[in-house]
Structures are given as C-alpha cells and as structure tokens.
Regions:
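Short, Lys/Arg-enriched anionic-surface-contact patches
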Residues: 1-14, 63-71
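Short, amphipathic alpha-helical "recognition" segments used to contact nucleic acids or chromatin
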Residues: 7-24, 74-83
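Mobile genetic element proteins and their domesticated derivatives, centered on retroelements
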Residues: 15, 29, 40, 51, ...
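Basic, flexible linker segments flanking DNA-binding modules
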Residues: 52-148, 154, 213, 224-227, ...
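Mobile-element integrase/transposase regions
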Residues: 68, 109, 113-169, 173-176, ...
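A structural microfeature
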Residues: 177-178, 371
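Charged alpha-helix within mobile-element recombinases
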Residues: 219, 225-310, 352, 356-357
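C-terminal, beta-rich DNA-binding module of retroviral/retroelements integrases
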Residues: 281, 285-386
Length: 386
C-alpha cells in the first residue's frame, strides 16, 4: 500500500505494532510497509531492545575514526589562523609543519574544512577579471634577475595625512627588499629608498615597473630621472604594457596582502605605519610559506647580488665607430649641423649616434636605443622598449 504523507517515524511505529501483533511473516510485513527485509529485521531488533525510542534516527558517525583530526591539531591550526587571518590552510599547515614536524597534520583540503567549520573562513566576493595579455617580459630564473617595484595605492592615516607605500621585491625569491611609507610620490624621496636597497642587496639585472611616475615620464622613450640613473648603474628598466597590471601580477597580489595585514585600519601616523610595514616584511620574508617556492620562505631562497653598488657612477662606454655627444641641460644635442631636442632628463649625459644607413642614424643611451634620426628631414622617431 502507498505510504505517502506518513512520516518515517510514524511508519516505523506502525511496523512495530504489526510486528508485535503477529499474523504476518517478516516478508509479508516488509512488502506491506514497502521496506526491504534487511530494514525490517533492523527495526524489529531495535524495538525489542529499546522499545519505541529505538526506532528513532541514529547517528551515522563511526564509533572509531582513525583519520579524525585530533583536538590539539585543530586547536593549533585555528590558533595559527587567528594570528595570520590572511593565510590559507596550505600556508598555515606548511608553517606548522616546520615548527612541529612530528605532529599528524591534515591535508590542506581537510585544514580548509576545519577552518570553515570553526567560522574562520570568510567567503570572498566574486571579482570579475579581465583576460590576461601575454607578457613579453622575460621571467626570472635566479635571484636578482628581476626586481619589481610599484606604489601601492595611497591611503589616509589617522592624522588625516596620506601614506604612499613604495614597495620593491625580488621576482624569483619573492623577498621584500623595501617597503617604505612615503608622504608623496616624488623622485627625491624614491631615489634614497633604492640607494639603500642597492647598498644592502647589490644591483639587479632588470627593474620592472609600470608607466607611472617617477619610474617613467612624458617624453623620449618615457625616460625619467630615476630610470636614467638605473641605466647608468647598468640596470635595464622594464615597463609593463599600459593598462596591463597583470604583467606585474605577483607584485599586485603582494599589495593585496600588504593592505589586508597593515592598513585595515591604517596606523595613526606615518612613523607608526612604517613600523607596521617593517614588522610585516620581517614575517613575510622569514615565516610566511610560499606555494610557488614549494612552501619555502623568501629569505631561504634569496642571495645578495654579486654586483655591488658603486660609490661613483661608471662612465658610459660606446663602440669606437659611434659618434658620442653630450646632452645640454636644456635637453638638446648638436648634431648634423644644428640643435636636436631629446629630453631634459638626459641633461649632462652622453648619447651616441650609430650610422645604420646613408643619412639614417640610430641614437643610443647606455644599453637602450632611443630613436632613429633621418638627417634629410631632421626627423627623430622614438624607438619603444620594454
């Protein structure tokens, strides 16, 4: 007979009464109530042992769970999450394994489930992401191949002044080389930060930035005073494509972590914010595991550059068959019978003209090509570089 509209518990009670009354075999009872013989014998056994109370739903949890996570492990994981709220289960477990290698730590998926069960995981908002463009920039295969730099977006401090965080990282090891709380974006404040980094860590091969100031400027090849200085030191400036911050994606991700751990809420004043940055960078470099590094720390994967910071800028050297000219403070150079304007940021520097065809010259500065110069029309055509 159909038993629609009857609750499972009422159905079990009816079965138990019919079982006690007798008159029907177990097979007939089970057919009558639409259950299997296995279920019928189970209900009958529970009724005989516990009465009607035995017919209620029983827990499906096993009596013994050999793979269950221990209370001490769960407590340690949750405590680590409270101390590092921006770390996921994978990073937390990697750090805990280093400090307590003999403990039976769970898999990252189990760790995530434990954190969620204890209310320590906040579901992130969905963010629309654009399609990444292929990056033409070379990867870093060892420390100091590429350093990346950027200004994290400014924010207001407790005293109503603004903080402009300047950050500098080694791309290969993820080491934070500098994180400076500056009151403004200006070359006069930025250059000393790079000088300290160069003294502490040596010189990189390439320095990657966006196209904003003071890393770039309007004018010929978007050279700035800062990038001219880098070139004089033998550092190749690299710029990501306009409108493509994903080409510096690891640095952008670092900025999100930096903001979450040091600026929510901001400090009372600039000096206090700098102390937060210093504490964060120490932990980020020496304690925070990185999945891209096999859960190692940046400090364990970094070594200083073998290229020391010079006490004086080395002179520029060009091939002997190039024609070298000194740029005036006005940004002009005398060439082909008249003045030729380049850019004021090259004032006092030496550039070189290489003849590549009859009446056609390539203009060089340090290791980069600046422009093509056509003598007949006196036309200067900039040559873009990365």
């Amino acid at each position: 007979m159909p038993w629609q509209g009857v609750s499972p518990m009422d159905l079990r009670r009816l079965f138990a009464r019919a079982y006690v009354a007798g008159g029907l075999s177990m097979t007939e009872l089970c057919e009558h109530y639409g259950i299997s013989r296995k279920t019928g014998y189970k209900w009958a056994a529970r009724f005989e042992l516990q009465g009607l109370e035995g017919l209620g739903d029983h827990s499906r949890r096993p009596h013994h769970s050999p793979r269950a996570t221990g209370a001490a492990v769960t407590h340690a994981l949750c405590d680590a999450r409270r101390r590092h709220p921006t770390w996921g289960a994978r990073k937390l477990l990697a750090g805990l394994r280093r400090t307590r290698p003999t403990w039976p730590w769970p898999a990252p998926s189990t760790g995530s489930a434990l954190l969620k069960a204890h209310g320590l995981v906040r579901t992130p908002r969905c963010r629309r992401r654009g399609h990444a463009s292929p990056s033409p920039l070379a990867p870093a295969t060892r420390p100091n191949d590429v350093w990346t730099t950027d200004f994290k977006g400014e924010f207001r401090l407790g005293d109503r002044t603004y903080c402009y965080p300047l950050t500098l990282r080694d791309l290969h090891s993820r080491l934070v080389l500098r994180c400076d709380a500056l009151p403004e974006k200006s070359g006069r404040l930025v250059r000393p930060c790079f000088e300290r980094a160069f003294r502490d860590h040596g010189l990189p091969e390439r320095l990657r930035s966006d196209n904003g100031g003071p890393f770039a400027a309007p004018g010929l090849t978007r050279l700035s005073h800062l990038s001219v200085w880098w070139l004089r030191l033998g550092i190749q400036p690299e710029r990501i494509a306009l409108g493509h911050p994903e080409q510096n994606g690891a640095h952008e991700q670092f900025h999100r972590v930096l903001k979450a751990e040091t600026a929510r809420p901001p400090a009372a004043h600039l000096a206090a914010q700098q102390r937060r940055f210093r504490h964060f960078c120490g932990e980020y470099n020496t304690a925070r595991p990185h999945e891209a590094l096999g859960d190692a720390t940046p400090a364990s994967c970094y070594a200083a550059s073998p290229r020391p910071y010079p006490t004086r800028l080395p002179p520029l050297e060009y091939p002997g068959h190039w024609d070298v000219r000194r740029v005036a403070s006005t940004g002009q150079v005398s060439w082909a019978g008249g003045p030729l304007y380049l850019t004021e940021v090259l004032g006092g520097e030496h550039v070189a003209f290489e003849e590549v065809d009859d009446g056609l010259w390539m203009l060089h500065f340090a290791t980069i090509r600046l422009a093509r110069f056509e003598a007949r029309t006196r036309t200067l055509t900039p040559v873009p570089y990365a």
